[in-house]
């Protein structure tokens, strides 16, 4: 049976600037009336003057309509890969215009001498000029100012050590017992992805991570399986794998998960007897899903002495990390699904900013929740298994070389290993009595971090080509009609 060809080149993601905003509006227009109706029905449920049974029916109907809209919108974005990129670009354009207005207003205040305390002059250089930076900065500053994003000090604790007796450690007061079953050292890259599948269900307060020490002496290396975002609420919790960490990583700021990953690696090395001066020289392979891929790229984008760990290899699955340029000596394989919207949340086109090897896979839409299926860690585990099978059949090219380099981190038969599990959690800061403006101004900047730029993505105009020859004047409409009719007449001679 002949296989149906699959489209691999997604122009809407590669060159999103070639698509007008009207294209996005026409695609999402079918859900707008249903969304408005859902909001109206939901408003009826909040009217206290209505009978309780009417409000209950309205509430139930609103929930059902919301579920239907969610399924329909997921199908639209799944069937048209790249709409997510256009959506982020549209939001970035709005944020850029807002930042431009704010910059002009601040300059006016400074120019007329109304800036008595000088805070406008101090804030003016901090207003981003790029749309995506303005969008992320606005979300972080507003969330911090209103007290929603209040992540504090980061803590780590050992959950299990295969070299300890007993292996499982007693949970800390107030912490539930971790549900961990995959305790063996991984043998393949897909095993690390499968470990992430289980870590999502560890039932700990913060994310659980799995660290495997492979080999001894100069051959010693470390494997780290890292989960993605676990808390999608807009208010900080004790789980640092949240929205605040995502925003801070996009802006190149220090995040709770980055700090936690470095601390758990240092704790594992300390338990294994590694001298402190070697902590930044021990090679580490990080397999990260979603947010975990961003954390891995962020740690690999700076020198090992600055990051605190030596990230030598990355396997990123579904991570929006194209804004981060990793070091040239880091072997990176980025796996993404064509229908997964999460890798496009960094606002960048589908291109590689460095020497990473990118791998894509086109999925078949399931019956329900297609976007969840496209971003699921278990779906990516299946994709990595297919990828391993592919490079075994065709062991040549950049992809096979990169996969072989990452596979070299895995333990050889009979090589000693040690498996440790850690938990990362954070404190919640108490809102201070400072004013909103002071809280926003106190946000630190990203040091020497510079996001990867795609110059064509910011091109506003294209050079106009010179006219080669004067266009020929077209005949009038009556003349063209008579000429067409004359050609249809029969020859009566």
Where would I find each of the regions flagged by the language model?
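Gly/Ala-rich beta-loop-alpha elbow adjacent to hydrolase catalytic centers
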Residues: 287-300
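Alpha/beta hydrolase fold serine-hydrolase catalytic domain that processes acyl esters and thioesters
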Residues: 2-283, 302-493
């Amino acid at each position: 049976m002949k296989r149906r060809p699959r489209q691999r080149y997604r122009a809407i993601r590669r060159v999103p600037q070639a698509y007008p905003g009207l294209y996005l509006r026409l695609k999402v227009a079918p859900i707008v009336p249903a969304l408005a109706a859902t909001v109206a029905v939901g408003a009826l449920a909040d009217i206290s003057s209505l009978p309780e049974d009417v409000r209950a029916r309205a509430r139930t109907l609103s929930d059902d309509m919301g579920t239907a809209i969610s399924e329909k919108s997921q199908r639209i974005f799944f069937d048209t890969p790249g709409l997510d990129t256009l959506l982020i670009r549209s939001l970035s354009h709005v944020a850029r215009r807002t930042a431009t207005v704010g910059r002009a207003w601040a300059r006016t205040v400074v120019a007329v001498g109304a800036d008595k305390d000088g805070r406008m002059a101090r804030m003016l250089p901090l207003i981003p000029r790029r749309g995506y930076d303005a969008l992320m900065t606005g979300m972080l500053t507003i969330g911090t100012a209103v007290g929603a994003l209040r992540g504090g000090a980061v803590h780590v604790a050992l959950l299990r050590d295969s070299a300890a007796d007993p292996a499982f450690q007693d949970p800390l007061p107030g912490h539930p017992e971790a549900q961990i079953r995959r305790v063996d050292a991984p043998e393949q890259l897909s095993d690390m992805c499968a470990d992430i599948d289980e870590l999502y269900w560890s039932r700990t307060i913060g994310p659980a991570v799995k660290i495997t020490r492979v080999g001894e002496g100069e051959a010693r290396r470390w494997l780290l399986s890292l989960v993605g975002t676990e808390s999608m609420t807009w208010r900080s919790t004790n789980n640092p794998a949240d929205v605040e960490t995502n925003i801070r990583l996009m802006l190149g700021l220090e995040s709770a998960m980055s700090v936690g990953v470095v601390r758990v690696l240092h704790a594992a090395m300390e338990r294994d007897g590694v001298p402190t001066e070697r902590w930044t020289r021990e090679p580490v392979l990080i397999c990260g899903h979603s947010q975990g891929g961003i954390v891995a790229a962020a740690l690999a984008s700076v020198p090992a002495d600055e990051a605190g760990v030596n990230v030598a290899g990355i396997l990123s699955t579904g991570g929006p990390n194209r804004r981060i340029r990793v070091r040239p000596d880091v072997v990176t394989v980025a796996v993404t699904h064509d229908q997964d919207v999460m890798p496009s949340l960094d606002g960048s086109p589908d291109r590689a900013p460095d020497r990473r090897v990118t791998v894509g896979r086109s999925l078949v839409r399931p019956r329900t929740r297609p976007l969840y299926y496209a971003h699921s860690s278990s779906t990516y585990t299946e994709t990595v298994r297919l990828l391993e099978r592919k490079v075994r059949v065709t062991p040549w090219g950049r992809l096979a070389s990169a996969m072989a380099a990452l596979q070299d981190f895995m333990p050889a038969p009979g090589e000693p290993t040690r498996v440790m599990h850690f938990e990362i959690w954070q404190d919640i800061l108490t809102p201070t009595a400072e004013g909103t403006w002071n809280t926003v101004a106190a946000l630190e900047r990203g040091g020497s971090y510079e996001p990867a730029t795609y110059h064509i993505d910011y091109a506003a105009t294209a050079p106009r080509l010179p006219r080669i020859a004067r266009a020929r004047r077209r005949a009038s409409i009556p003349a063209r009609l008579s000429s067409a009719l004359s050609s249809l007449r029969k020859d009566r001679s």
